[in-house]
A protein has these predicted regions:
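Extracellular polysaccharide-degrading/modifying enzymes targeting complex plant/algal/animal polysaccharides
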Residues: 29-327
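Sec-dependent signal peptide recognition
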Residues: 2-11
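Hydrophobic h-region of N-terminal signal peptides that target proteins for export
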Residues: 10-19
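Boundary at the C-terminal end of the N-terminal hydrophobic targeting segment
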Residues: 22-23
Length: 327
């Protein structure tokens, strides 16, 4: 063998601490205090799980692999992604595990900082500069906060469905407060066992009617219209600053890029762990549904925070996880 080639091969084996003898296991270490330019061994861990996955992919299926993660919160903006041929085998599995009993969290969210006091017990924070997602969930101190809604509890009732029984209905005077920014408003209407969640297009305050951006209820089956189950179906409205009046409620003004939140009396705004989601999934495995997905194990890891945005034309549930396709 050419001596230069031999030297290069030995360098990579030593530098990356990779043992390729039969029966051995490849171990890559990750720490929040690591460095993605390091070799990933015990004394020189990598910083991100993504880099660890990238480094081991050429060896997946050839020997057992463990990505060992030290205590900490690891934030991702896109899911950890694998193809069907990158998932190990029965003899050579891929494991992504916490080190000993360390607390390891993989989070698809971004923490909010620098809250400012507004009036009426409300605090606000500006969205991160590079954050461009729409979202409808805010996590505060490890719980899902309540999106500002009206009424706070129970429901309103439709006075009468509009002529097409699909895209608009009438309401009673003073049913809900006058909303300044209708473009941020969402309607949630109950169809017996399912719901429609859809953006409001306009509100005619003179004629007391509300119109949505598309059909309320799934287009098929055809009976998913406004008044099929109840002549005066239940509904509530979400995401208006006028509704943000109770502890634990929040509202987002997407035009101003600001979130408003009403803390509970026992919450210190400076210690608030408020997270908005960014990653649409946490783990994504590509492949045909009939393919063997391989052998990948996650052990001792907590997964938190994902972003699911309702379709632009609305989410209309049907049954058994089926919903109206409006892509």
């Amino acid at each position: 063998m050419n001596k230069n080639i031999l030297k290069i091969a030995l360098f990579f084996l030593l530098y990356f601490n990779i043992q390729i003898f039969p029966g051995d296991e490849l171990k890559i270490y990750v720490s929040v205090n690591g460095n993605d330019n390091s070799n990933g061994n015990f004394d020189s861990p990598l910083k991100t799980i993504q880099k660890a996955i990238e480094n081991v992919k050429p060896s997946i299926g050839k020997l057992p692999i463990s990505i060992i993660i030290s205590e900490g919160n690891y934030r991702i903006e896109m899911p950890l992604e694998f193809n069907a041929d990158e998932l190990g085998s029965v003899d050579n599995p891929l494991k992504i595990i916490s080190r000993n009993t360390d607390s390891v969290v993989i989070s698809g969210g971004i923490k909010l900082k620098n809250w400012k006091k507004e009036s009426n017990g409300i605090w606000s924070v500006t969205l991160p500069e590079n954050y461009s997602c729409k979202f409808n969930t805010l996590y505060v101190n490890d719980r899902r906060a309540i999106r500002a809604r009206f009424p706070d509890k129970d429901y309103l009732h439709v006075k009468k469905a509009g002529e097409d029984n699909r895209t608009n209905f009438f309401f009673e005077k003073n049913d809900f407060p006058n909303v300044n920014k209708v473009s941020n408003l969402e309607l949630v209407l109950l169809h017996d066992w399912s719901i429609t969640r859809i953006c409001v297009k306009e509100i005619d305050w003179e004629n007391l009617s509300l119109k949505t951006v598309d059909s309320i209820g799934a287009r098929s089956p055809a009976f998913f219209n406004i008044s099929n189950w109840e002549p005066n179906p239940r509904y509530f409205l979400e995401n208006a600053i006028e509704f943000c009046n109770s502890p634990g409620e929040w509202y987002c003004d997407f035009e101003q890029r600001k979130i408003y939140y009403v803390p509970f009396p026992n919450e210190d705004i400076n210690e608030l762990n408020a997270v908005i989601p960014i990653s649409p999934q946490l783990v994504k495995i590509n492949g045909d549904r009939l393919q063997d997905r391989g052998y990948i194990n996650f052990e001792g890891i907590t997964f938190e925070h994902t972003n699911w945005v309702i379709p632009e034309r609305g989410y209309c549930g049907i049954q058994a996880c089926m919903y109206d396709n409006r892509e």
